Curated annotation (Swiss-Prot):
Tissue expr: Component of the acid-insoluble and acid-soluble organic matrix of the aragonitic skeleton (at protein level).
Residue ranges, annotated region (Disordered): 49-168
Skewed-composition ranges (Basic and acidic residues): 91-117
Signal peptide (UniProt feature, chain positions): 1-20
Compartments, as annotated in UniProt: Secreted
UniProt superkingdom: Eukaryota
Taxonomic lineage: Eukaryota, Metazoa, Cnidaria, Anthozoa, Hexacorallia
Keyword Cytoplasm among record annotations: no
Organism: Acropora millepora (Staghorn coral)
This protein's name: Secreted acidic protein 1A
Keyword annotations of the record: Secreted, Signal
One GO term describing the cellular component: extracellular region
Acidic residues bias: start-end ranges: 71-90, 118-168
Length: 168
């Protein structure tokens, strides 16, 4: 009788491991995501999430993603990580430095030091250099090659295109 009971327990454990049924030795200090497979955070972290943000939707989202919320319910460790508040605690630009000064001026100075980017801005300079631009429409024949000969005329002097050059 005891042998039969041991066999039943053995096969129950074996069956449980193959089917992925929850084991009684499961870690009780862990919170797992929706499908029950991966550990996201511990109960201690979850308790800080519950204390900081009373909104249940944010609590569940924070538990699933593993994001710790600050005192205002925003992602981060403290008020210093809140992006919409400048350093004096009032609303302001995100790029203010620690003294509350705007860093936009620093960015403008950096752009001036770097110089202007003249990628294809001045077509007049290109034309003055004598470039043969196919997109110029200043009387150039786009069919001309570098020699200046009209490609529509063959070497015998006969016009290759079907136009009537008589002017009629």
């Amino acid at each position: 009788m005891a042998r039969d009971l041991l066999l039943v327990v053995f096969f129950a454990c074996l069956l449980q491991s193959f089917w992925g049924l929850p084991l009684p030795l499961k870690n009780e200090n862990a919170i797992v995501d929706g499908d029950g497979t991966s550990v996201v955070t511990t109960k201690e972290d979850a308790s800080t999430i519950f204390e900081r943000d009373p909104n249940p939707a944010n609590q569940v989202s924070a538990m699933v993603t593993g994001v710790i919320l600050d005192e205002n319910g925003d992602p981060g460790e403290s008020d210093e990580s809140v992006e919409n508040v400048d350093n004096d605690g009032e609303g302001g630009d995100k790029d203010d430095d620690k003294n509350g000064e705007d860093n936009d001026l620093d960015n403008k100075e950096h752009e001036e030091e770097k110089g202007d980017d003249d990628r294809g801005d001045d077509e007049e300079e290109d034309d003055a250099e004598g470039d043969n631009d196919s997109n110029d429409n200043e009387g150039d024949d786009d069919d001309d090659d570098d020699s200046g000969d009209d490609d529509d005329v063959d070497e015998s002097g006969a016009d290759e295109d079907d136009d009537d050059d008589s002017g009629d």
